[in-house]
Every structure is written in structure tokens, then in C-alpha cells.
Regions:
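Gram-negative and organellar
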Residues: 28-545
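Bacterial N-terminal signal peptides that target proteins for export
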Residues: 2-14
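N-terminal signal peptide c-region/cleavage motif recognized by signal peptidases
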Residues: 24-26
């Protein structure tokens, strides 16, 4: 079975498990359960203000928004399938799957929990443009991306000891068949694009809180393995380390840790012709040669350490910051969580790690809260709307996918950057703001002709903002805006910049079963070779069951 087939099977099982768990709970234990399927029809017009070209299509969609919340099970899913029919010969028909699902179930209360999640979205996969933004339905650079994860988590106490353990299985599939079919342009750079991967993550720790001793301590270890289809790539990481936390006041503690880590990334050599040139498919894909020895793309093996502070001035605020040695150089990481009040929250982080696309996407998906905001942008039905952030219903929580979707490449890379989320609401107002900066340095085998990304660095910055206001019980307005900048770092390639703003209006009728909506948007793209300004308009009707 293909990875895409496995994704669909597991996504269906995820929803079935959540609903079955809800049905199995006694009525007194239920908090809330809601399943809201719908069908929808839209008429969309896109006008390129630079060329004067106008494209029109009709979209027919079916989807479901559902949530379950009990004492032991919490789950939520937002899924949408859309079929688009182009008017005229300039826009071909197409379809798309978009959605996100999360599940958390307490198998043994206060001891063993199972978590699972699934994602279906669309993102640019040619490595030369902004991550998210306005695109036509038949843009071959846009790929369908599917991912799924599941696993148990153990957290318990044995006497004075805290014992934790977890296992997580992850699956990622990128459907970029349209891009594969394009002929390779003369002089084009060969990019090793991602296809699919499976990964396994295992961790365990034992420790003691401050109290039994004047300091807290933890000893733990972990193992990670990812196997990708392209060129039989393999990423393997293992570590063991010990950490201590020493309070120096009621709100401040010092922390330090030391350990050992080994990371190795390898893959097949590439097939070459008699002249030593790489053999590629008509779409520019490299072909592996299993008869040759495997190539090492990245390796680190040695002692790691870091030290820092933990600051908790109140139950609403926590700041952690660390500096150390890892990956052969200095690392700096930090995190901040601050509840301004019950209505507004803020979170931020500075990150540094060696990653792969599959590993990073699964980590981002697992960071999405179970209770998330299911609102979508009407002119770009991507996960989380136009931008790459999904906000939790708890103010200041959520996850941004920009660091994963910066480039859908098959290589391992050093990933450094920062992100910030600010969200909340009061009365009829609700809003979310997210920003992310990410820099990647790629690692590929050092061979003559064949790998274009080795030791190259790309960068991206994304800013997203969205707000809604309820005008009445049956009417709502929304406003969304984004700005993306991306520099691929490839020789001869210029940086790309895109912006967009969308406004929408929603009106419900017939006991809230029928909803009419309209939206207007303006989108710009500038990548040096191609500039465009597109105005978009939409009217639609949705019927909920």
C-alpha cells in the first residue's frame, strides 16, 4: 500500500476511534460532542491586474468539522475535499484535500496516554518560491502533503522518582506528480525533492524533583530513525544525557546538562552515464544506484552540553534560555509562554537542530493543540487559512508550519530560527498573529555533479494575521493578511516575496443550516522573473447537516 493510502486509512481510523470513544463513555462523563458535515458550492473569479487575464472556476466541496471532549478523550477534526471546475481552456479542473485532526486519549488516567494526529495540506515544493500564498488550482509547483503520527506516552511516579517514556510513529507523503512530469529546462538545477518517509521516535527518562534533594535531576535518552523513499535515504539519531536544576530563588533556577549524541544521515549514490553525468528522469529527478556503496551526507558524534536559566515569576509566565555546544558549534535555544490574562496569550521560541522535512513536519503537527481554531480562509483553503499557522482555542497556543514547509527537500539540514504566536479575543472579537524566521543549511554527499543543495543556506520569513468579529448571532466578518519572503540560496536564483489580504462576510439562515458567504482578496508575488498582482472574488453557499 502506498504512503498516501496508509495516510487515508489511518486518518479514517483516527476519526472512528474518537467517535467510538465518545459513544463508549457514559452520558454523565460527556462534556461535549459535535459532528458537523456540510456541502458547499462556490463561484470564484481571479483577475491578474498586470496581464489582464481573468480566470473563473466553480468549486464544489464536502467536509466535516467535528469535536469530542470527555474526561478521558479529546479529539477534533476539520477536513474538506474540494473539486474545482475551470471555465475555459486556461484553467484545468482539479481537486484537493485539506484538513487537520488531533486525538488525545487517557488509556490509564495520570499514567498512560495515546496521541495521534493527521494533516492534509498544500504547499510549494519546487524550492524556489514562498511557502504559502495565492496559487491557481493547476499550478504544478503546488503539491499535496499528507502526514500522520500516533503513539503512547507514559508519565508516572515510582516512589520519589518521575518516570517518563514515549514512542511515536510518523508517516509523511508528498504528492508532487504534476511537478515530476514537467520537462527539465536547459541549465536547470537538479533538486532532490522529497517523496515519502516513515519515522520512529523513542525516548525515556527518570528523575527527581527539587525537595528530596536541594536540586532536581533527570537522566534520559532517545532514539530516532527515518527512512525515506528517495535514494533510500536514512536519518538516524541517538543521545543520552543528564540534567540538573538548581533553584536560586523563588522564581529563578539554574539548569545545566551534559551527554553524548550521534547523528548520521546517508543515502544511495546516484546513477551516472558513461561520461559521469547524473542520469535523471524527464522531470529532473535523480535516480539511485543500489550497486554502489552508500554515501554519507552528515555525521556528528561526541559530547554535548548546555546551561541556562528557568524563570517563573508567576503561574502565567515561564521563560527558559540555554546556550551550549552541539552539532560541532554553539547552540542557543529559548522558549517563552505568557498568559497576559484569561483572554490573551503569547508564546515564542528560538530553535536550533539538525532535521529532515519528515521529522520536522511530524514535530510541528504534534505541537498543534487538540482544541484548535478550525476557521479557514475562503480564498485559500489551506490548513489554517492562507498562512502557515494553526492557533489553539487557548490564547497564545498553536503551531506554525513555516519551518517545515520552507523547502520540501529530501536532504537533512541544520535548522535555526525563531517564531512567535499571539492570540486571543474579547466579546465578539477574535484574532491570531504568527511570525517565523528560519534558516537552513543543507547537508548532502560531497560528490562531483549531482547535489545542488550541499552546504547551501536558504532563509524564509513569514508573518500572518487574522481577525474575526461577530456582527450578530448569525453574521460574521473576517480579515486575513500575510507576507512571505524566501531566498533559496541557489546560484542565479533571486529571492521571492508575496503578500495577500482577504476580507470575508458570512450570513446564516434556516436555523443556521444554510450559510451564504462572500470574500474579496488582493495578492502579490515578486520573484524577480515573474511578478503578478491578482484580485480575487468569491461568492458561495454552504449547507450543514
Amino acid at each position: 500500500m502506498s504512503a498516501l493510502g496508509q495516510f487515508k486509512r489511518w486518518a479514517v481510523r483516527l476519526g472512528a476511534v474518537a467517535l467510538a470513544a465518545s459513544a463508549a463513555m457514559p452520558a454523565s462523563a460527556r462534556v461535549s460532542t459535535g459532528v458537523h458535515p456540510y456541502i458547499e458550492v462556490q463561484q470564484v473569479l481571479n483577475a491578474d491586474l498586470d496581464s489582464g487575464e481573468t480566470l473563473t472556476y466553480t468549486a464544489v466541496a464536502a467536509g466535516v468539522d467535528a469535536g469530542v471532549s470527555t474526561r478521558r478523550v479529546r479529539a477534533q477534526i476539520s477536513y474538506r475535499y474540494e473539486k474545482r471546475f475551470g471555465w475555459g481552456d486556461d484553467l484545468v479542473d482539479g481537486d484537493s484535500h485539506t484538513g487537520i485532526a488531533q486525538l488525545s486519549a487517557d488509556l490509564i488516567p495520570n499514567m498512560l496516554r495515546a496521541s495521534a494526529g493527521a494533516l492534509a495540506t498544500r504547499a510549494r515544493s519546487d524550492g524556489v518560491g514562498p511557502i504559502f500564498g495565492f496559487t491557481n488550482v493547476d499550478d504544478p509547483a503546488i503539491s499535496e502533503v499528507y502526514s500522520f503520527y500516533a503513539g503512547p506516552e507514559l508519565s508516572t511516579r515510582i516512589g520519589a522518582l518521575n518516570v517518563t517514556g514515549s514512542y511515536r510513529f510518523g508517516l509523511v507523503e508528498v504528492d508532487n506528480k504534476a511537478l515530476r512530469g514537467l520537462p527539465l529546462a536547459p541549465g536547470a538545477i537538479l533538486l532532490d525533492r522529497f517523496d515519502s518517509s516513515t519515522n520512529h521516535s523513542l525516548s525515556a527518562s527518570v528523575g527527581m524533583d527539587v525537595g528530596e534533594l536541594p536540586f532536581g535531576w533527570t537522566v534520559g535518552g532517545g532514539y530516532f530513525l527515518e527512512e525515506a523513499d528517495r535514494l533510500d535515504q536514512e536519518f538516524e539519531a541517538r543521545f543520552i544525557r543528564g540534567d540538573v536544576v538548581v533553584p536560586v530563588g523563588s522564581t529563578l533556577a539554574l539548569t545545566a546538562g551534559v551527554g553524548y549524541e550521534k547523528i548520521e544521515s546517508s543515502q544511495q549514490d546516484i546513477l551516472r552515464d558513461a561520461a559521469g553525468r547524473p542520469v535523471v528522469t524527464p522531470g529532473g529527478r535523480l535516480i539511485g544506484d543500489p550497486t554502489k556503496p552508500r554515501l554519507l551526507a552528515y555525521e556528528t558524534d561526541g559530547i554535548i552540553w548546555d546551561a541556562g536559566v528557568i524563570y517563573r515569576p508567576s503561574r502565567r509566565t515561564e521563560l527558559q534560555a540555554r546556550v551550549g555546544q552541539r552539532y560541532g558549534g554553539t547552540t542557543v535555544t529559548a522558549s517563552l509562554s505568557h498568559k497576559i490574562n484569561e483572554r490573551y496569550g503569547l508564546s515564542a521560541s528560538i530553535y536550533d537542530g539538525v532535521e529532515t522535512f519528515g521529522r520536522l513536519l511530524i514535530a510541528d503537527l504534534a505541537a498543534v493543540p487538540v482544541e484548535f481554531d478550525i476557521r479557514r480562509n475562503p480564498l485559500n483553503n489551506n490548513v489554517g487559512g492562507i498562512g502557515g499557522c494553526v492557533f489553539g482555542t487557548d490564547p497564545g497556543t498553536g503551531a506554525c508550519f513555516d519551518d517545515a514547509f520552507q523547502s520540501i527537500a529530501g536532504s537533512s539540514f541544520r535548522n535555526r530560527g525563531a517564531n512567535i504566536l499571539f492570540s486571543g479575543g474579547r466579546g465578539p472579537w477574535g484574532f491570531g498573529i504568527g511570525a517565523n524566521y528560519s534558516s537552513r543549511r543543507y547537508y548532502q554527499p560531497i560528490v562531483e555533479q549531482g547535489f545542488a543543495l550541499d552546504r547551501r543556506t536558504d532563509e524564509s520569513f513569514g508573518l500572518y494575521a487574522g481577525a474575526t468579529r461577530d456582527l450578530s448571532r448569525t453574521s460574521t466578518v473576517s480579515l486575513d493578511a500575510y507576507a512571505n519572503w524566501f531566498d533559496s540560496g541557489l546560484t542565479g536564483a533571486e529571492s521571492a516575496f508575496s503578500t495577500g489580504i482577504t476580507g470575508g462576510y458570512y450570513q446564516s439562515f434556516l436555523f443556521d443550516r444554510l450559510q451564504a458567504h462572500a470574500a474579496l482578496g488582493l495578492f502579490t508575488t515578486d520573484n524577480g522573473e515573474f511578478d503578478s498582482t491578482v484580485a480575487s472574488a468569491l461568492v458561495g453557499l454552504r449547507y450543514g447537516f
